[in-house]
Design a protein with these regions (language model features):
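Extreme N-terminal starter segment of soluble prokaryotic enzymes
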Residues: 2-11
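Active-site beta->alpha loop and helix N-cap motifs at the rims of alpha/beta catalytic domains
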Residues: 13-34, 40-136
């Protein structure tokens, strides 16, 4: 019998904080009713940053949901979160921002699935590697 490995398309979805209420409804449907969706697609991650996040790249996101609730939802479905910290103008004095460091500490705690960060700044990348080694 020819057992072929079926390729899977891993989708990386936007709006980690901005679309939290949508994902609270969509994710149960996606995982509990797989027959409604193509079997060759999967959710690789959901990315974003909350409103007023200094390390974000200036996007106009309006998500202000509790980061613990957001993380809990993704853990429930085994989905990786990716924080978008793509601000290209960061300087060393910005690295101590309480909101951003708090988010990193929270998302760094998750063993399974591992969470990641999308960065632009080498300065921020080095900082994150040293202080939050579980983030990829």
């Amino acid at each position: 019998m020819d057992e072929r490995i079926k390729p899977t398309a891993h989708y990386h979805l936007p709006g980690l904080f901005e679309f939290y209420e949508f994902y609270r409804v969509f994710l149960p449907l996606f995982y509990e009713h797989r027959e409604w969706f193509y079997d060759w697609c999967d959710i690789g991650s959901i990315y974003g940053a909350p409103a007023d996040c200094l390390w974000d790249g200036g996007r106009t996101g309006y998500g202000d949901d509790d980061p613990r609730a957001v993380l809990s939802l993704l853990r429930e479905y085994g989905i990786s979160a990716r924080l978008t910290f793509s601000n290209s103008l960061l300087r060393e004095e910005h690295l101590s921002d309480n909101k951003c460091t708090g988010l990193c500490a929270l998302f760094n705690e998750s063993e399974t699935p591992r969470n990641g960060v999308i960065v632009h700044s080498e300065l921020l990348l080095d900082y994150l590697r040293q202080r939050y080694p579980k983030l990829y």
